[in-house]
């Protein structure tokens, strides 16, 4: 195979197709380059949610799920689906890591702390998994069970915390097990960009009982709302008892079960509790030691602890197939989506394949990306164009983060600005690839920026279930209907004249 063979997979993160113009940044943005490629080349749309990506029917897709399905070239049944089935069939209550955790707490008269994202968004966690853990604690007759709730407001509506707090309180009251101990917005507890000052605020509330104090979880929300601070950004707060003491703090040898299933935003805070050698901030003299730490799924090799649900092994992902065929590949993205084009695209593998190069461009250090809608798209593009000029790569996997990351703000104009910046860069990248005799697949992993405001003009910060576009920049071809994300890697391999492996049950979108 000639070394000048070139094909690219370009993922416009959070960019989907929706007819309604109102609240739709994709429709309202000026996108001359995307429109040019859509009109010039074969195009269609792909399902990127629900059963098409291994999620429950009607469940919106997300970046982790999307990149896993894309890279695997097959439908990958997601952790949400696996755990739901496990609860329904009763296996959940027999999982070794859970049993050891509750038995450890019971035997040593220690507390069991349950923490995770408190919503039914289904992107990072699901509240039903917390309820199942509370039932497990009840079954084992545990008394000291505490919930450290991370409020969402991003994968669900921005002001929905009260609903989830009430649902959780009702379950705890019904079972006679569990109390809220701390409440934090996910902005603090689930940072993934090394903003350790945020994580420390959450840690200090959970370990030292430091932070604003309230008598109930609902009071935390009410007070923050009064100051126009909504779910995602709620300041880490401590629930106190009748003596104004914290209901619970995390102490030596306590048990912790972290019920998020998606790794990327769970890693940093996990390391603060699980890793004895943690050094990213000073944890203080009373940092709890010898904790029994359980992750719902395998968050990372960098987190010490037990894993409840081990990953499903994915062989022959697109990166592995490219390496087997002695083709060079480049993975490039800015920080926010770097794990997606590397770890998730490779089926949960951290290490590069032979011939794989990775370029990480730092995302801008701003509080929220609506303040800088272009993010680092120009820097990503410049780095890629330089790499293309070298002529060393055969396959490019590129992610433009902006439509998703700015779309999460629920602010229409910044999201339009984000998409227009991406469109400018998309034009440069495709023109360069075409000049070099290569082809590209332009697509997305899920919806978001296609619905930033509701029809009632309220911010819509969650993903959507809308189909995503696919364009293949090759003349004289047609694309078939009925495509899903799992068909993208077989299509990329097709452009490179590489046979797809039997493990890839997806099929090339190019009509034969």
UniProtKB/Swiss-Prot annotation:
UniProt record, GO biological process: glucose catabolic process; glycolytic process; sporulation resulting in formation of a cellular spore
Chain positions recorded as Mn(2+) 2 binding sites: 13, 63, 445-446
Keywords recorded for this protein, A-Z: Glycolysis, Isomerase, Manganese, Metal-binding, Phosphoprotein, Sporulation
Domain of life where this protein originates: Bacteria
Pfam families assigned: iPGM_N, Metalloenzyme
Keyword GTP-binding part of the UniProt annotation: no
Cofactor(s) required for function per UniProt: Mn(2+)
GO molecular function, one term: manganese ion binding
Pathway it works in: Carbohydrate degradation; glycolysis; pyruvate from D-glyceraldehyde 3-phosphate: step 3/5
Entry keyword annotation includes Nucleotidyltransferase: no
Record text on cofactor binding: Binds 2 manganese ions per subunit.
Chain positions recorded as Mn(2+) 1 binding sites: 404, 408, 463
Catalytic site positions: 63
Record's catalysed reaction(s): (2R)-2-phosphoglycerate = (2R)-3-phosphoglycerate
Its EC number(s): 5.4.2.12
Annotated Gene Ontology cellular component terms: cytosol
Residues reported in the UniProt entry to bind substrate: 124, 154-155, 186, 192, 262-265, 337
Protein family according to the UniProt entry: Belongs to the BPG-independent phosphoglycerate mutase family.
Function per UniProt: Essential for rapid growth and for sporulation. Catalyzes the interconversion of 2-phosphoglycerate and 3-phosphoglycerate.
Assembly and oligomerization: Monomer.
Protein name: 2,3-bisphosphoglycerate-independent phosphoglycerate mutase
Organism taxonomic ancestry: Bacteria, Bacillati, Bacillota, Bacilli, Bacillales
């Amino acid at each position: 195979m000639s070394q000048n063979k070139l094909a690219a997979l370009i993922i416009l993160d959070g960019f989907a197709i929706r007819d309604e113009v109102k609240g739709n940044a994709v429709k309202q943005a000026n996108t001359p380059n995307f429109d040019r490629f859509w009109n010039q080349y074969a195009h269609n749309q792909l399902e990127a949610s629900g059963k098409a990506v291994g999620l429950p029917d009607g469940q919106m897709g997300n970046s982790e799920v999307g990149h896993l399905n894309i890279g695997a070239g097959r439908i990958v049944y997601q952790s949400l689906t696996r755990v739901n089935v496990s609860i329904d069939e009763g296996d959940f209550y027999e999982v070794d890591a859970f049993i050891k955790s509750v038995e450890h707490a019971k035997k040593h008269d220690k507390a069991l702390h349950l923490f995770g994202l408190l919503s039914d968004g289904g992107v990072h966690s699901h509240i039903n998994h917390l309820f199942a853990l509370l039932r497990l604690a009840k079954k084992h007759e545990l008394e000291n069970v505490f919930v450290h709730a991370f409020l969402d407001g991003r994968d669900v509506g921005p002001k929905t915390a009260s609903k989830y707090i009430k649902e959780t309180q009702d379950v705890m009251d019904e079972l006679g097990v569990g109390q809220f101990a701390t409440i934090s917005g996910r902005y603090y507890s689930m940072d993934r960009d090394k903003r350790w000052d945020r994580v420390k605020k959450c840690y200090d509330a959970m370990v030292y009982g430091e932070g604003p104090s309230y008598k109930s979880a609902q009071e935390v929300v009410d007070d923050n709302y009064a100051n126009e601070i909504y779910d995602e950004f709620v300041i880490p707060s401590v629930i106190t008892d009748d003596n104004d003491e914290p209901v619970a703090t995390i102490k030596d040898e306590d048990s912790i079960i972290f019920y998020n299933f998606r790794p990327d935003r769970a890693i940093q805070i996990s390391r603060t509790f699980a890793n004895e050698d943690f050094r990213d901030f000073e944890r203080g003299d009373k940092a709890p030691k010898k904790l029994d730490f359980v992750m719902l799924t395998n968050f990372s090799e960098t987190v010490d602890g037990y894993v409840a649900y081990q990953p499903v092994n994915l062989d022959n992902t697109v990166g592995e197939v490219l390496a087997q065929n002695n083709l060079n590949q480049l993975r490039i993205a800015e920080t926010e989506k770097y794990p997606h084009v590397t770890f998730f695209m490779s089926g949960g593998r951290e290490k590069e394949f032979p011939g794989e190069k990775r370029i990480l461009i730092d995302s801008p250090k701003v509080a929220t990306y609506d303040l800088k809608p272009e993010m680092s798209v120009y820097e990503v593009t410049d780095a890629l164009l330089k790499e293309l000029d070298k002529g060393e790569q055969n396959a490019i996997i590129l992610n433009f983060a902006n439509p998703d990351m700015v779309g999460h703000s629920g602010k229409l104009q910044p999201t339009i600005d984000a998409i227009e910046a991406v469109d400018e860069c998309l034009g440069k990248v495709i023109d360069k690839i075409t000049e070099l005799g290569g082809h590209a697949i332009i697509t997305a992993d899920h919806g978001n920026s296609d619905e930033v405001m509701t029809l009632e003009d309220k911010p819509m910060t969650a993903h959507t279930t809308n189909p995503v576009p696919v364009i293949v920049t090759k003349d004289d071809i047609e694309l078939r209907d009925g495509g899903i994300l799992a068909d993208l890697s077989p299509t990329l391999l097709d452009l490179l004249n590489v046979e797809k492996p039997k493990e890839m049950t997806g099929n090339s979108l190019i009509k034969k």
